Curated annotation (Swiss-Prot):
This protein's record includes keyword DNA damage: no
Assigned GO CC terms: cytoplasm
EC number in record: 6.1.1.20
Keywords of this entry: Aminoacyl-tRNA synthetase, ATP-binding, Cytoplasm, Ligase, Magnesium, Metal-binding, Nucleotide-binding, Protein biosynthesis
Family statement: Belongs to the class-II aminoacyl-tRNA synthetase family. Phe-tRNA synthetase alpha subunit type 2 subfamily.
Protein name in UniProt: Phenylalanine--tRNA ligase alpha subunit
Localization per record: Cytoplasm
Binding site for Mg(2+): E390
Subunit details: Tetramer of two alpha and two beta subunits.
Residue ranges of the TM segments: none
Source species of the chain: Sulfolobus acidocaldarius (strain ATCC 33909 / DSM 639 / JCM 8929 / NBRC 15157 / NCIMB 11770)
GN (gene name): pheS
NCBIfam families: pheS (TIGR00468), PRK04172.1 (NF003210)
Catalytic activity of the protein: tRNA(Phe) + L-phenylalanine + ATP = L-phenylalanyl-tRNA(Phe) + AMP + diphosphate + H(+)
Length: 465
């Protein structure tokens, strides 16, 4: 059974025998996409054969148009020489930057020779008619001339594929079909002139993809849900932070390499610190622990936070009620070369537990529970070092196909830090690189794909937590 539009296509092909899809679309006034699908249906029914014909087109570039109008550089050079030798310096004053190109091509064509600082013509009657004809009609140009024009970027070559439809059966039933009976058709009895189209009750409806969140944003939201389910309170702070919270309060010395300009983004201006007691305690902590003269002006410098542990530092400085369980998940910034595994802007999750009897064993237990809920069932711990925790631990998770991969750094906060914050309790803290974790869980080879906007790619990505 043929549809009305299928009959239109066959009727047109009956006259032409063969036509491309664009031509049929234009003549029948049907969308090109409809011609493609209808041709496929007709091919399945044996009425037509679909083929592909490659068409090569050449187009003049802006430089090509210029040369057609003004002449080739070597052509202009010959005109300037007018059959007589000339100094390169004199020619350069007249032709400018085109002289180098002109000499290069003129020598290739044996039109000139160079003798010391002079250009000497070998001919004065060379015509450029072949090259100009090739610019006007590249399709019929000599292959050697064509390649020259292409290499000089005077023309571009474009290859197009045309869908060509050939009629196989000239006999077909030119019967009009209707899809529904109307009261007018019944009254006038005109329905007898038509065939009623059959319905395929087994046909599936068209697929309409539903809207959904970007998979990485969804992943971050689900991580937050995991932390909240475990009783943690989300705490946020700004991206611009004083070095006091980003470094000093975390017992990182003021001469530490991480504080250099190449490891953190500096921001103009200075912050303000009103808590004199806090400054005094931090000064004592640094000068006693690191044996140097601590400078409060350095602590006031502003940076784009390089770790969300800066939020943990702010939590501690606010002297929260004990017990306290908090976390922060947000962007951090570090100078780096962007590639498949590095970005200058990425996400971290930091957590802190402040509790009277909180132990190192308790910390390992909560880390194990967090990673289990994320979907990493097997983890192991190795001793580590971080300036603001002691003891410290590195957390490794087992990822299918990759083996053991580092996931997090953690530890109990140093007594000096807790004393400076006037906190009479133990505290455990940890940090997780979220972008790297997402790469591993989603099986991505390129960290930049976490921020992809390719719709087909995004539709395939699913978050399973």
């Amino acid at each position: 059974m043929l549809s009305e539009n299928e009959i239109k296509i066959l009727s047109y092909l009956k006259l032409k025998k063969k036509a491309n899809a664009e031509e049929i679309s234009k003549e029948l006034g049907l969308p090109l996409s409809s011609i493609f699908s209808l041709a496929k249906l007709l091919e399945e029914k044996g009425y037509v054969k679909i083929g592909e014909r490659k068409i090569i087109r050449f187009e003049l570039t802006e430089e090509g148009k210029k040369r057609l109008k003004e002449g080739f550089p070597e052509e202009i050079l010959l005109k300037e020489l007018n059959g007589q030798p000339s100094l390169i310096e004199d020619l350069k004053n007249k032709m400018g930057k085109d002289l180098e190109i002109a000499i290069s091509w003129a020598r290739k064509k044996n039109l000139v020779k160079i003798d010391q600082n002079r250009v000497i013509p070998n001919t004065s009657n060379y015509t450029f008619s072949t090259e100009k004809e090739a610019l006007l009609k590249p399709e019929s140009a000599d292959e050697k001339v064509l390649q020259e024009l292409l290499s000089r970027k005077l023309i571009t070559r474009k290859e197009e594929s045309k869908l060509e439809i050939t009629l196989l059966k000239e006999e077909f039933e030119e019967q009009n079909y209707i899809t529904q009976l109307t009261s007018e058709l019944l009254r006038s009895k005109d329905w007898k002139k038509y065939k009623i189209r059959e319905y395929n009750v087994e046909a599936l409806p068209p697929y309409f993809p539903l809207a959904k969140k970007h998979f990485f944003r969804d992943f971050i939201e689900k991580l937050k849900d995991v932390m909240k389910e475990l009783g943690f309170t989300e705490v946020n702070a700004g991206y611009i932070e004083m070095e006091l919270y980003n470094f000093d309060l975390l017992f990182q010395a003021q001469d530490h390499p991480a504080r250099e300009i190449h490891d953190s983004f500096r921001v103009d201006g200075l912050g303000k610190i009103d808590d004199e007691r806090l400054l005094k305690e931090i000064k004592e902590m640094h000068e006693k622990g690191w044996k140097y003269s601590w400078d409060p002006q350095i602590a006031k410098r502003l940076v784009l936070r390089s770790q969300t542990t800066a939020v943990t530092a702010r939590i501690l400085s606010s002297r929260p009620s004990v017990p306290f369980k908090g976390f922060s998940l947000g962007k951090v910034f570090r100078p780096d070369s962007i590639d498949a595994t590095h970005l200058i802007e990425f996400h971290q999750l930091d957590g802190v537990i402040i509790q009277k009897e909180f132990s190192f064993t308790d910390l390992l237990g909560i880390l194990r529970e967090i990673f289990y809920k994320i979907g990493i069932k097997e983890i192991k711990f190795k001793p580590g070092y971080f300036p603001f925790t002691e003891p410290s631990v590195e957390v490794y998770g087992k990822i299918e196909g990759l083996g053991w991969v580092e996931m997090s750094g953690a530890g109990l906060l140093r007594p000096e830090i807790l004393k400076a914050m006037d906190i009479d309790a133990n505290a455990g803290a940890w940090g997780i690189g979220i972008d790297r974790l997402a790469m591993l869980l989603f099986g991505l080879k390129d960290i930049r794909l976490l921020y992809a906007n390719d719709i087909d790619f995004l539709r395939k990505m699913k978050v399973r937590l």
